[in-house]
From Swiss-Prot:
InterPro entries: G-protein_gamma-like_dom (IPR015898), GG1/2 (IPR045878). It comes from Oryza sativa subsp. japonica. This is Guanine nucleotide-binding protein subunit gamma 2. GO terms for biological process: G protein-coupled receptor signaling pathway. PANTHER family: GUANINE NUCLEOTIDE-BINDING PROTEIN SUBUNIT GAMMA 1, GUANINE NUCLEOTIDE-BINDING PROTEIN SUBUNIT GAMMA 2. GO terms for cellular component: plasma membrane. Residues 65-97 form a coiled coil. Residues 1-59 are annotated as: Disordered. The gene is RGG2. Guanine nucleotide-binding proteins (G proteins) are involved as modulators or transducers in various transmembrane signaling systems. The lineage of its organism: Eukaryota, Viridiplantae, Streptophyta, Embryophyta, Tracheophyta.
Length: 150
């Protein structure tokens, strides 16, 4: 109380988020397991006092780790099964060349419906729009300016 009058606040212990702490502890355990332990680190680990609630946290970390491992194994089994099914399906299929040959023979005599049947334009009056203009005043004007339109 006296510190509050002087503008100082009481120091309270920080509140811990148990879900985040469990995840952080799990990551720390995984990091420790992943790297080799030197002799000096082993001595430091022996000297550290264990937390009072550390046993329960370690048990939950082990359970979560086991659950993750079993889920990963189940996912890999499922992927393996789907790949095996696909392989069996590919083994029973006929070669692609036979399928292509069937497509070629079925479409060989038929004309393409998207291509026009006539050789020239259907309407001859449309042809004039695609021809070059022979002479016009505007064309002569552009030619006098050094353009390439003539």
């Amino acid at each position: 109380m006296r510190g509050e009058a002087n503008g100082e606040e009481e120091q309270q212990p920080p509140r811990r988020n148990h879900l985040r702490d469990d995840a952080e502890e799990e990551e720390e355990v995984e990091r420790r397991a992943a790297r080799p332990v030197s002799g000096q680190q082993q001595q430091q680990q022996r000297r550290r006092p264990t937390d009072v609630g550390g046993g329960a946290a370690m048990r939950s970390v082990g359970y979560v780790g086991k659950h993750r491992l079993s889920a990963a194994i189940a996912r890999l089994d499922q992927e393996l099964q789907s790949l095996q099914d696909e392989l069996n399906e590919l083994e029973t299929m006929e070669p692609a060349s036979a399928a292509c040959q069937g497509v070629i023979t079925s479409t060989e005599g038929k004309s393409d419906p998207l291509l026009p049947v006539t050789i020239g334009p259907e309407n001859a009056s449309w042809e004039r729009w695609f021809q070059r203009v022979r002479s016009s005043r505007s064309n002569k004007w552009w030619a006098s300016k050094g353009s390439d339109f003539s």
